[in-house]
């Protein structure tokens, strides 16, 4: 399971279970010169790929970018796109210093989830706009890699909402039913 993160003002500190990476401030990815970092870097357990385009290579996580600033996508912009119907992605919310997850019993359509995440953040004493967002598409293969149950894999294949726990990183991913005509949004 590849794991990708980014932050607006600094790298999110991230230590995988195998202790593979830990990035804070403006530290460079191992083996990558700082001058090559565009302000956004795609991180995986297996490799580090600096990336300057709006969309990553095939098979990597795809973020929803703001056309005026393809390097960064902060929560208010992501929420705006979700409310506009850009769904079918996995939504994670991160803070530099902490992480919290939506309770699995609170699954809802994407627009309601976008509003709900703000509500939960406020209830936890956090400013929703302090959170950073990663968006990932899930496939039945991803579910298999995460030791998901056949029932959830089948639900994912039907396009239904599924709450998935990554057994490797212990993160919660929330997937939504795609509602955009024509399938995936690429622009």
At which residue positions do the language-model features occur?
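Ordered hydrophobic segments in well-structured contexts
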Residues: 1-7, 40-43, 60-64, 76, ...
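ADP-ribose/NAD+-binding catalytic cleft of ART/PARP-like enzymes
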Residues: 1-41
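Non-membrane alpha-helical secondary structure
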Residues: 4-7, 74, 78, 82, ...
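Short, flexible beta-strand-to-coil junctions
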Residues: 6-13, 46, 64-70, 125
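A broad, structure-centric signal for solvent-exposed, well-ordered loop/edge residues
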Residues: 10-14, 22, 50-51, 103, ...
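ADP-ribosyltransferase catalytic core
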Residues: 24-108
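C-terminal, well-folded lobe of enzymatic/effector domains
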Residues: 94-187
């Amino acid at each position: 399971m590849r794991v990708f993160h980014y932050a607006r003002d600094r790298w999110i500190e991230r230590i995988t279970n195998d202790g593979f990476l830990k990035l804070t401030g403006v530290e460079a990815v191992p083996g990558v010169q700082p001058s090559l970092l565009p302000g956004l870097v795609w991180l995986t357990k297996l490799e580090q790929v600096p990336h300057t385009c709006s969309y990553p290579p095939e098979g990597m996580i795809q973020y929803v970018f703001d056309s005026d600033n393809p390097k960064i996508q902060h929560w208010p912009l992501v929420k705006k796109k979700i409310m506009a119907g850009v769904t079918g992605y996995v939504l994670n919310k991160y803070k530099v210093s902490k992480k919290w997850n939506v309770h699995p019993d609170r699954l809802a359509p994407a627009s309601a989830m976008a509003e709900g995440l703000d509500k939960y953040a406020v209830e936890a004493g956090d400013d929703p706009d302090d959170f950073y967002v990663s968006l990932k598409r899930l496939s039945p293969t991803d579910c298999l890699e995460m030791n998901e149950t056949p029932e959830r894999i089948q639900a994912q294949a039907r396009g239904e909402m599924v709450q998935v726990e990554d057994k490797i990183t212990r993160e919660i991913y929330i997937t939504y039913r795609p509602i955009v005509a024509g399938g995936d949004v690429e622009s």
